[in-house]
Amino acid sequence: VYWSSHSTGTHAGAAVEKDHAGSVSVAFGRPSAPENSSLSGGANGRSTTAGQKQTAWSDHFADGDTADLSFLIVGSTRTDNGSGVDQDLLTDWTTQVNQAILVAEARKDCMVIASPRRSSVVNVSNESTQSTNVLADFNTATSTSFGVFDSTWVYQYDRFNDKYCWIPANGHTAGIMARSDLQRDAWVSPAGFSRGQYLGITKIAFNPKQASRDDLYRARINPVTTFPGQGTILF
């Protein structure tokens, strides 16, 4: 669109440099061959440290007047070890879960939803060992009426990265709690075959048998179990 009289010094094909009233202007050249460049010198981002996550719970969610929420969902507790390498330590898991519980107990208007560590259940072949690991994890968590603990990680499709991955089950657990609240009432249990079904997952890392489910239940941990023909259920 022609809307003004521009200097011909900037026309395509003009001399590379042209003097206009004592100044030098650089002309626009015609397109040339594609430019090939290689990005270098960058670095991958790091995971947050346990201390950073602990501080974030207090800084962003402690004030009930400014942070309106019902669930504090403790996601993956993997942290940076200070040199850019991820780690999955029980001490870091305990720090993060207990800090979230402190926030919830102080607010008294929300609940913490937590899953065990990834290394406790994922790629652990023995069901009995998985049960022992989960019990050991939650044995370090503060006993509270403001927390809900489940027993596993789930394997599902990540449509944003076009791949399958393991994630903590607590996001799904919070979802079925919200659904139960919406369809029934807040005090109605979201567990069982009618209200406790996990959707959109391929498999779970730890599928506890009856003996393990009994042990988990006594330790205030809600077993997540897959039943043939029934799906995956918060039991």
Locate the predicted segments by residue.
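A glycine- and small-residue-enriched flexible loop/hinge signal that marks low-structured segments
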Residues: V1-F235
